[in-house]
UniProtKB/Swiss-Prot annotation:
This is 5'-methylthioadenosine/S-adenosylhomocysteine nucleosidase. The keyword DNA damage does not apply. GO terms for cellular component: cytosol. Pfam families: PNP_UDP_1. It comes from Baumannia cicadellinicola subsp. Homalodisca coagulata.
Length: 229
């Protein structure tokens, strides 16, 4: 088993990379790659950069160069549900684009041409994540995450998202692109995101203020998942 983990930003992968034994670090196509061992398992961790294209590139490297057998996407997200708070962890049951529109050709909003509307996460990885957090004080919510190349900062963008995608509980900029690559390679994936903001008019400030603190909880959870696999 080779476990692939991918995050967009240095802050999102830094703590997990420090846990890897026999660590090798290098760069390819502007992706920072960390290869090592954790809990007796081979782990390849990629810091891809922000956005859908960077995420798709990083995931493709994981699957072609390292033949990862599963992919865990980690990082931050903006909360869309009023029930969510900063520090809550979101586990993707399914993911979808919010900035894709080829409805002129009969597709639904958010559906890429020639692809399904929704990309489901691995049920077993979702179940394992839920199981590992049952007896903790971490609030874990499973549901739909939507992705696009927009940092949602309140206003009309937030209003449009909530109106067009009422089932979505969180928004990010990478996980659906990663899911699409995993779909092409028939490799199981799950997205695990921590809420850093609630996508409102001060979300940029909340994101900066909260990122380092809340990501520490996420790193511990991912380490537990790797141990349990």
């Amino acid at each position: 088993m080779i476990i692939g983990v991918i995050g967009a930003m240095e802050q999102e992968v830094m703590l997990l990379s420090k846990q890897l034994a026999k660590l090798n670090i290098w760069q390819q196509a502007r992706c920072n790659i960390y290869s090592g061992w954790l809990h007796g398992k081979k782990v390849v961790l990629v810091q891809s950069g922000i956005g859908k294209v960077s995420a798709a590139l990083g995931c493709t490297l994981l699957l072609t160069n390292f033949e990862a057998t599963l992919v865990i996407n980690i990082g931050s997200a903006g909360g869309l549900s009023p029930a969510l708070a900063v520090g809550d962890i979101i586990v993707s049951e399914e993911v979808q684009y919010h900035d894709v529109n080829v409805t002129a050709f009969g597709y639904d909003k958010g559906q890429m041409a020639q692809y399904p509307l929704l990309f489901p996460a691995s049920p077993s990885l979702v179940a394992l994540t839920k199981q590992l957090t049952e007896h903790t004080n971490i609030n874990v919510v499973c549901g739909q995450i939507i992705s696009g190349d927009i940092f949602i900062n309140g206003g009309q963008e937030l209003y449009k998202l909530k109106r067009r995608f009422p089932q979505a509980i969180a928004v990010d900029m990478e996980v659906t692109a990663i899911a699409q690559i995993c779909y092409l390679f028939a490799v199981p994936f799950v997205g695990i995101r921590v809420i850093t903001d609630i996508a409102d008019s001060v979300s940029h400030k909340s994101f900066k203020d909260n990122l380092i603190t809340v990501v520490s909880h996420l790193s511990l959870l991912v380490s537990d998942i790797i141990q349990a696999l």
